[in-house]
Amino acid sequence: MYLEEKLHKIKKPIMVLGTSSGAGKSLTVTAICRILKNLAEQPIPFKGQNMSNNAWVDWEGGEMAYSQALQAFACGVNPSSEMNPILLKPQGNSVSEVIHLGKSIGTTSAKNYYQDWFIPGWEVIKKSLNSIYKKNPNCRLIIEGAGSPVEMNLKHRDLTNLKIAKYLKANCILVTDIERGGVFAQIIGTLELMKPEEKKLIKGIIINRFRGDLSLFEEGKKWIEEKTQIPVIGIVPWLNDSFPPEDSLDLLENKSRFTNAEIKVGIIKLPSISNFSDFDPLENEESILIEWIRESQNLKKYDFIILPGSKQTIKDQMFLEKTGLSHDLREYSNNKGHIIGICGGLQMLGTFLEDPFLKEGSKTFSEQKIKGIGLLPLRTTFFEEKLTRQISSESLWPCQSKINGFEIHNGQTELDNTQNSLKINPIFKDLNLGWYKENKEGGTIAGTYIHGIFENDIWRDQYINLIRMNKKLPALKKRTSSYKNKREKIIENLANEFNKHLNLSSLLN
């Protein structure tokens, strides 16, 4: 294998391990990727195995975790599923879809995963590493671990942490979150549970999310270094809500920073919600305030409502019916409301959902065909084969503009010809990518299969202007910066903040 022959010649990879989940590994990797890019290195992100329903589709149609796609943007390279060779997408009841190198290859229970998938998983990780280095022999891999590297009941079967570190002889950083408390016990406990040869790989410690005067931790820093004989290479202060966690869902949970927002958006909090990165562009709009809708309520206070993607569309539609939210959405539509569904949300807005292969949460024969919300005359059937691809098209509504995004879905949607009273129109020149309906009473119902639709600045502005016109507000001013430019600025600011408090020099040998 190419890599094993060249291992002694490659630039030392940097691996970011954490004392726990949520310690800040993802953002640390993102920051390091951009710092090294700015130093004219060729960084490439890597995470052997990730568990997330927040996915991205690369240019070859391969699925990967969104966090690795974001890290690729920080590196200035195109995302590739090789950067995240194993993606586990939870489906509920301890069952996950298994994706190897971007392609779905089955489902597994948590109990059976390591028994059935450990060996093939390690092979696909090695295959990806080999391919990355063969294509980019001068790159420096920036690797993200997962959770804690010393879960002793799982350590011998852990594909994502120390097994990769030892295989690549990586320079490892241990990141810990001081905001949670117990930082000394976290660091010492993690290191004590490592074997001597594993501990030798740890070249630096980062204290993350420190609040207050950094000089107040000097004594703590000295104690850690004396106790562990490992340098503390960074004490990173608490960074405000400008920088989202890995999947950005936690940021949305507490979103209220634009207190003077003119448009209030409600997002239905589905139990199996997926691809919530679809909302990131809206979070950055100063005119918009986002709130989660978790239970049945009067929806009149919202200027428009988003029904998001779902990993289990049948199951989530049953949730909407059970909670009364389906009824609430119909009432909202009848009262001149604006609703947009994305992927699974589009499917639920239709008249019927059929799941003959039990792909979307059906458990019994009676659940294989259920009614949708009934706001669009569309029928969806879920098949075994999944469609994953990048999209370039042109919108017809609410404006004519070029559109980019991606699709991830098992369902195939077609017009329900039994519902002649519900007239709908295509949103895009590619007719099967989305539909919309204008209500006689006012308001619109729209649905699209395109993830990332709101990243398209012209389309997003015109959709928001449609809502603003409904409220008799002036149209948005012509924008001076695109969403992608804003994302770049956020990544650059993140790297600058980390760079002020981080010393990577000892790891770049």
Swiss-Prot record:
Pathway: Cofactor biosynthesis; adenosylcobalamin biosynthesis. GO terms for molecular function: ABC-type vitamin B12 transporter activity; catalytic activity. CDD domains: GATase1_CobQ. The keyword Nucleotide-binding does not apply. One of its GO terms (biological process) is cobalamin biosynthetic process. The active site is at C343, H451. Keywords: Cobalamin biosynthesis, Glutamine amidotransferase. Residues 262-459 form the GATase cobBQ-type domain. It holds the Pfam family GATase_3. Gene3D superfamilies: 3.40.50.880, P-loop containing nucleotide triphosphate hydrolases. HAMAP family: CobQ (MF_00028). Belongs to the CobB/CobQ family. CobQ subfamily. Catalyzes amidations at positions B, D, E, and G on adenosylcobyrinic A,C-diamide. NH(2) groups are provided by glutamine, and one molecule of ATP is hydrogenolyzed for each amidation. PANTHER family: COBYRIC ACID SYNTHASE (PTHR21343:SF1), DETHIOBIOTIN SYNTHETASE (PTHR21343). This is Cobyric acid synthase. The gene is cobQ.
